[in-house]
Regions:
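Alpha-helical transmembrane segments and their lipid-water interface positions
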Residues: 2, 108, 112-113, 201-202
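Intramembrane alpha-helical segments
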Residues: 7-92, 96, 175-189, 196
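Functional transmembrane core segments of multi-pass inner-membrane proteins
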Residues: 40-52, 66-121, 134-147, 153, ...
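Residues within membrane-spanning alpha-helices of integral membrane proteins
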Residues: 20, 24-27, 45, 49, ...
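Multi-pass membrane catalytic core of lipid/isoprenoid biosynthesis enzymes
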Residues: 1-45, 122-163
Length: 212
């Protein structure tokens, strides 16, 4: 892919051996950290690893590969809750954020794949844009954004309803609208702005603690 050819591994700036060594140490530290937290967390620790290993290969057989990425990242807030309690008692708090993350990342990744539309078609790579077309991809992404917004509104109104939470939701909504409107242009700008959403969600969760 010409778009990703300058990245460290494709460009040769990072050797395969170095990347494999880095991967080995990263996984080792991750598993050790899970083991130190508690047995329950350690037992569940292979699940995120499996999802991140499988995700890149999903582009070879399903257009819904974006949702595998969304699933892999949506485990983050849920796993954080499990790590904090070593059980599933906090699931009612973390599940709405997990659902938000799933649809937010899936919707964004669909729009992000628009820039590889021609390349994916030529090389037989599966994605929502390459299989269902650009217009349908934007529609599916919009539905994902709407569902994610409903999920975070639910979390906000139930647990953190205050002026700050309303402001954050409005900013996220405007960000979504911006992404959809500019989805056929340079993806870098809304990739940058999209990265700020995670920070906004962190502020939203912190406000839950401050305003209780």
């Amino acid at each position: 892919n010409p778009r990703t050819s300058s990245r460290p591994l494709p460009s040769g700036r990072a050797s395969k051996n170095f990347v494999l060594l880095l991967l080995f140490f990263s996984i080792s530290i991750y598993l050790l950290s899970c083991w130190l937290i508690c047995d329950f967390v350690f037992i569940l620790s292979p699940i995120p690893l499996l999802l991140f290993i499988v995700y890149p290969y999903t582009k070879r057989f399903t257009a819904f590969c974006h949702f595998f990425l969304g699933l892999a990242l949506s485990i983050g807030p849920i796993a954080g809750g499990v790590a904090a309690t070593c059980d599933l008692t906090g699931l009612y708090l973390t599940l709405p954020i997990g659902i938000f993350t799933f649809f937010w990342i899936s919707g964004f990744d669909i729009l992000y794949a628009l820039q590889d539309y021609q390349h994916d078609i030529r090389n037989g790579i599966f994605s929502v844009p390459s299989i269902y077309g650009i217009n349908n991809a934007i529609k599916i992404s919009s539905v994902c954004f709407i569902i994610s917004l409903i999920a975070i509104c639910y979390y906000s109104f139930i647990y953190t309803f205050n002026f700050l939470s309303i402001l954050i939701i409005l900013i996220i909504l405007m960000n979504y609208i911006f992404q959809i409107i500019h989805s056929l242009r340079n993806n870098y700008s809304f990739f940058k702005y999209n990265s700020y959403i995670g920070i906004l969600i962190l502020i939203l969760v912190i406000s839950d603690i401050l305003f209780i």
